[in-house]
């Protein structure tokens, strides 16, 4: 994916860039595979804000993506189109199966229009094919990996993401995640060969706040500049530090929220590297 940089004709254009969409072969989605996507604005059924910084944005239709592919084993499919999906960073591929059905999948890097792909234990190890981890050789780059057999892909689905299959031990496969974490996954789980395409998406410079509003992202305001009625850090004469340990607008302390005793922690072989753990 190529990135086009704008000339600084206006302050909003300066430093901004946009995708060239060279891989896209069709601009309108398959009508049978889209559903309405009503906007919530970050509110729940009571109208209370449960997720901040959401609201507005361009209208979207949700594309139904096949994250399982287990009911199409042994049925070849032709890549009809590579399409843009506003609901995710990766592009999507429209498949035409030989039995007449059409489905969307996440488009991996190198997948071409007209290419034939398939899924199942007898599928070849080539980009776009989906098969169980037990049938994939060690060292293969994969994406769209399941955490539980038959539950659908949960790992490595965003643009440019990939996982390396390091090896197999008993009933588990050992994976190196995009975060550098090494963890075990049931060997019956399925994965797609290759890495997710559209890797240059991370290099796009939005350039102005308005482009984020088009995406449905509202401004983020620090608590220390609010009034006391709006945030525990608000108020005070002049510029203050908040006067207490960092908390959310509802008083919950800042910090990690994952349960340290979560049942799946025993599947982690090696923790991901963080800034604190890196050698200086």
Swiss-Prot record:
Record region (Disordered): 1-47, 224-280
Record-linked InterPro entries: NA-bd_OB-fold, Rib_uL2_dom2, Ribosomal_uL2, Ribosomal_uL2_bac/org-type, Ribosomal_uL2_C, Ribosomal_uL2_CS, Ribosomal_uL2_dom3, Ribosomal_uL2_RNA-bd_dom
Entry annotated with the keyword Ribosomal protein: yes
Molecular function GO terms recorded: rRNA binding; structural constituent of ribosome; transferase activity
Skewed-composition ranges (Basic and acidic residues): 23-33
GO cellular component, one term: large ribosomal subunit
Basic residues biased stretches: 37-47, 270-280
Taxonomy, superkingdom: Bacteria
Keyword terms of this UniProt record: Ribonucleoprotein, Ribosomal protein, RNA-binding, rRNA-binding
Biological processes per GO annotation: cytoplasmic translation
Biased composition range(s): Polar residues: 258-268
Protein's UniProt keywords contain Ribonucleoprotein: yes
Subunit structure: Part of the 50S ribosomal subunit. Forms a bridge to the 30S subunit in the 70S ribosome.
UniProt function note: One of the primary rRNA binding proteins. Required for association of the 30S and 50S subunits to form the 70S ribosome, for tRNA binding and peptide bond formation. It has been suggested to have peptidyltransferase activity; this is somewhat controversial. Makes several contacts with the 16S rRNA in the 70S ribosome.
Family, as annotated: Belongs to the universal ribosomal protein uL2 family.
Name this polypeptide is given: Large ribosomal subunit protein uL2
Source species of the chain: Corynebacterium diphtheriae (strain ATCC 700971 / NCTC 13129 / Biotype gravis)
Gene name of the encoded protein: rplB
